[in-house]
Amino acid sequence: MVLDTKRSLKIKIDALKRLEKDYMLYKKEEQLQIENVERFKADETKDIYDVKKQIEILDENKTMIIDSVSRVTAFLVQFSEFLEEHKNEDDGSEIWKDSYDIIDQISTKFLGE
Protein backbone atom coordinates (compact mmCIF):
# COMPACT_ATOMS: atom_id res chain seq x y z
CA MET A 1 0.00 0.00 0.00
CA VAL A 2 2.82 2.40 0.86
CA LEU A 3 4.46 1.80 -2.52
CA ASP A 4 1.17 2.55 -4.27
CA THR A 5 0.87 5.78 -2.31
CA LYS A 6 4.42 6.79 -3.14
CA ARG A 7 3.80 6.04 -6.80
CA SER A 8 0.63 8.12 -6.66
CA LEU A 9 2.56 10.95 -5.03
CA LYS A 10 5.14 10.89 -7.81
CA ILE A 11 2.40 10.99 -10.45
CA LYS A 12 0.62 13.85 -8.69
CA ILE A 13 3.83 15.85 -8.26
CA ASP A 14 4.60 15.46 -11.96
CA ALA A 15 1.04 16.39 -12.91
CA LEU A 16 1.17 19.52 -10.77
CA LYS A 17 4.51 20.52 -12.28
CA ARG A 18 3.02 20.05 -15.75
CA LEU A 19 0.02 22.22 -14.91
CA GLU A 20 2.38 24.91 -13.62
CA LYS A 21 4.45 24.64 -16.80
CA ASP A 22 1.30 25.02 -18.93
CA TYR A 23 0.40 28.14 -17.00
CA MET A 24 3.88 29.61 -17.47
CA LEU A 25 3.76 28.91 -21.20
CA TYR A 26 0.39 30.63 -21.52
CA LYS A 27 1.74 33.66 -19.63
CA LYS A 28 4.75 33.81 -21.92
CA GLU A 29 2.51 33.49 -24.97
CA GLU A 30 0.33 36.29 -23.62
CA GLN A 31 3.30 38.65 -23.51
CA LEU A 32 4.26 37.75 -27.07
CA GLN A 33 0.69 38.22 -28.24
CA ILE A 34 0.43 41.63 -26.56
CA GLU A 35 3.54 42.66 -28.46
CA ASN A 36 2.01 41.32 -31.69
CA VAL A 37 -1.18 43.31 -31.17
CA GLU A 38 0.77 46.49 -30.49
CA ARG A 39 2.97 45.89 -33.52
CA PHE A 40 -0.06 45.25 -35.75
CA LYS A 41 -1.81 48.38 -34.46
CA ALA A 42 1.29 50.49 -35.15
CA ASP A 43 1.76 49.09 -38.67
CA GLU A 44 -0.42 51.12 -41.02
CA THR A 45 -0.07 48.52 -43.76
CA LYS A 46 -1.94 45.93 -41.69
CA ASP A 47 -5.59 45.37 -42.44
CA ILE A 48 -8.08 45.98 -39.62
CA TYR A 49 -9.08 42.31 -39.89
CA ASP A 50 -5.49 41.27 -39.08
CA VAL A 51 -5.51 43.46 -35.98
CA LYS A 52 -8.87 42.06 -34.88
CA LYS A 53 -7.61 38.52 -35.41
CA GLN A 54 -4.55 39.19 -33.24
CA ILE A 55 -6.81 40.61 -30.52
CA GLU A 56 -8.99 37.51 -30.78
CA ILE A 57 -5.94 35.29 -30.34
CA LEU A 58 -4.90 37.35 -27.31
CA ASP A 59 -8.38 36.95 -25.80
CA GLU A 60 -8.24 33.18 -26.33
CA ASN A 61 -4.88 33.11 -24.62
CA LYS A 62 -6.24 35.03 -21.64
CA THR A 63 -9.08 32.50 -21.42
CA MET A 64 -6.53 29.69 -21.35
CA ILE A 65 -4.64 31.43 -18.53
CA ILE A 66 -7.82 31.63 -16.47
CA ASP A 67 -8.54 27.99 -17.25
CA SER A 68 -5.04 26.90 -16.29
CA VAL A 69 -5.28 28.75 -12.97
CA SER A 70 -8.55 27.00 -12.19
CA ARG A 71 -7.04 23.61 -13.13
CA VAL A 72 -4.03 24.23 -10.89
CA THR A 73 -6.26 25.36 -8.04
CA ALA A 74 -8.55 22.34 -8.36
CA PHE A 75 -5.58 19.99 -8.51
CA LEU A 76 -4.00 21.62 -5.45
CA VAL A 77 -7.20 20.95 -3.50
CA GLN A 78 -7.33 17.36 -4.74
CA PHE A 79 -3.65 16.78 -3.97
CA SER A 80 -3.97 18.32 -0.49
CA GLU A 81 -6.94 16.06 0.24
CA PHE A 82 -4.95 13.06 -0.96
CA LEU A 83 -2.08 13.96 1.37
CA GLU A 84 -4.50 14.41 4.25
CA GLU A 85 -6.11 11.01 3.60
CA HIS A 86 -2.73 9.26 3.48
CA LYS A 87 -0.85 11.23 6.14
CA ASN A 88 -0.57 8.13 8.31
CA GLU A 89 1.67 6.64 5.58
CA ASP A 90 4.08 9.59 5.69
CA ASP A 91 7.43 8.02 6.50
CA GLY A 92 9.43 11.22 6.10
CA SER A 93 10.87 10.09 2.78
CA GLU A 94 11.96 12.46 0.06
CA ILE A 95 8.78 11.98 -1.98
CA TRP A 96 6.63 13.14 0.94
CA LYS A 97 8.86 16.17 1.51
CA ASP A 98 8.67 16.97 -2.20
CA SER A 99 4.89 16.70 -2.07
CA TYR A 100 4.57 19.23 0.72
CA ASP A 101 7.18 21.51 -0.85
CA ILE A 102 5.52 21.59 -4.27
CA ILE A 103 2.12 22.30 -2.74
CA ASP A 104 3.58 25.16 -0.68
CA GLN A 105 5.50 26.55 -3.65
CA ILE A 106 2.63 26.46 -6.11
CA SER A 107 0.01 27.56 -3.57
CA THR A 108 2.10 30.63 -2.83
CA LYS A 109 2.54 31.34 -6.52
CA PHE A 110 -1.15 31.02 -7.40
CA LEU A 111 -2.69 32.70 -4.36
CA GLY A 112 -2.66 36.07 -6.07
CA GLU A 113 -3.81 34.80 -9.47
UniProtKB/Swiss-Prot annotation:
Record carries keyword Lipoprotein: no
Listed InterPro entries: TBCA, TBCA_sf
GO CC annotation, single: microtubule
Organism: Dictyostelium discoideum (Social amoeba)
Alphabetically ordered keywords of this record: Chaperone, Cytoplasm, Cytoskeleton, Microtubule
Pfam families in the cross-refs: TBCA
Family: Belongs to the TBCA family.
Main location: cytoplasm
One of the GO biological process terms: post-chaperonin tubulin folding pathway
Molecular function terms, GO-annotated: beta-tubulin binding; tubulin binding
Name of the protein in its database record: Tubulin-specific chaperone A
